[in-house]
Amino acid sequence: VKPAPIWFESPPPPSRPPAAPERPAAAPVDVVIDGEPATVAAGATILEACRTRGLDVPTLCFLETLTPVNVCRVCVVEVAGSRALVPACSRPVEPGMTILTDSERVRLSRRMVLELLASSVDLSTAPGVGDLVARYGARPERHGPPARAAARGERDAREPGHHEAPDGAAAETVAQPVKVDNDLYIRDYGKCILCYKCVEACGVDAQNTFAIAVAGRGFDARISTEGDVPLPDSACVYCGNCIGVCPTGALMFKREHDMRAAGQWDEARQHTADTICAYCGVGCT
């Protein structure tokens, strides 16, 4: 007797949950910027809205690839109905918002911020910041001559509230000796404006190394390695991202620092390149 054939049936395909309906795109937002009506994308920041219209709002701590931290306060603008000036780099636009980017109140605030920076920080290798000082008529010299520079390690050893009160005769500064503890990078914190770009680039926004962070409080706040150890003993992988985002030259390649000191640095011979490699700052090519 011929056996009956055996039939194999493929199992039914697994059931899939119904696809979620697509969310409709948010409607554009109508705002008024410096007296001119504008329509911008929902969720855009005031800074993005201004730049799409060709308005120049200055920034120091902002970078498109980093999370806004609102620390420099140079990008503040005036918003109708708001008691305080708001940071344009992080404040999203709202329907009906009226924004002033260059009012007298805004200019006075930016001038004050720039005066405090220029009177306490060495901006000699930050031409962009120097241009802003001139643009807003800041007069850092009115705060008095610079106070004495801190001795090596003095600022690192300070504790909150334990430093001497200024006498008002001189402008307190962050001047201090350059840190040179390796053959690749130098750290000149006398030029640091605490924009936090290096901390973010070393952290979750780029490298995820977390070799540097902010230490101290108030005027004694500073960028430091963990435990204030020398850079070679820290978690630093020498990727160069911190140097790439530093706006003032506080973090610099040692070769550039040495060439500047010897008067051999030629800015016109420098060039930039676009890359997707997180280690491009190492200089493999």
Please state what every model-predicted region is.
Residues A25-V31:
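Short structural boundary motif marking the start of a folded domain
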Residues P24, P68-N70, G281:
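Short coil/turn motifs at beta-sheet boundaries
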Residues K2-P17, R73-V74, S82-Y238, I243-G244, ...:
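Fe-S ferredoxin-like electron-transfer domains
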Residues C277-T285:
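Short, intrinsically disordered, charge-balanced linker/junction segments flanking boundaries
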Residues V29, E36-P95:
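N-terminal cofactor/phosphate-binding cores enriched in small/glycine residues
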Residues R16-A25:
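ABC-family P-loop ATPase nucleotide-binding domain
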Residues I33-G35, T225:
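Short glycine-centered, acidic/aromatic-flanked micro-motifs in structured strand/loop junctions
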